[in-house]
Amino acid sequence: MISTNQFRNGSAIRVDGKRFTILSFQHVKPGKGHAFVRTRLRNMDTGAVIERTFRAGEKVESIRTDSRPMSFLYRDGDLYYFMDQETYEQVAIPEDVVGEAKDFITPNGEVSVLYADGEVVSVQPPAHVELEVVETDPGVRGDTATGGSKPATLETGLVVQVPLFVSVGDRVRVDTRTREYQTRV
């Protein structure tokens, strides 16, 4: 059990029998009345984000989480197979648990797999990944005066907006949090 004054961003807690990750929290002490803590929580199972208010000093159950580095091996149907880099154990993770991370996973690519209560909760890619452009329109000189962009399909199927000078076969760095083009590599 942890008190609301021990909340930290990224902490895992159990509220009403459901597992949540704390996205943000704010201690509020109004002029009248008792202090409280306003939080934004992400449900670990569904991904839904809710707002919840706790009384200051209220205790909630904490969840032990473990993050392990793993390498992506291959995909078979709707299962993604990863190898634990420490024990070399293979783990099959369903596509719905992998979620949006599938757009950034390449063979032998490293990810962080989050376990809560001994089961896989999420797959988190690194902050930036380098992917190859497999399809994009050719950029024509003089198309725009202020620099434009065009859609490009990357090797994982993700479509991002890239500058006109990027062509098929180029490798680009993409920010996995914003899903935006960063630079050509």
Swiss-Prot record:
Q: Name one GO biological process term.
A: peptide biosynthetic process
Q: Which GO terms describe its molecular function?
A: translation elongation factor activity
Pathway(s) served: Protein biosynthesis; polypeptide chain elongation
Instruction: Name a single GO cellular component.
Output: cytoplasm
Key words, A-Z: Cytoplasm, Elongation factor, Protein biosynthesis
The places in or outside the cell where this protein is found are: Cytoplasm
Primary place of residence?
cytoplasm
What role is this protein assigned? Involved in peptide bond synthesis. Stimulates efficient translation and peptide-bond synthesis on native or reconstituted 70S ribosomes in vitro. Probably functions indirectly by altering the affinity of the ribosome for aminoacyl-tRNA, thus increasing their reactivity as acceptors for peptidyl transferase.
Q: Which family does it belong to?
A: Belongs to the elongation factor P family.
Q: What is this protein called?
A: Elongation factor P
Which lineage do the record's taxonomy fields give for this organism? Bacteria, Bacillati, Actinomycetota, Rubrobacteria, Rubrobacterales
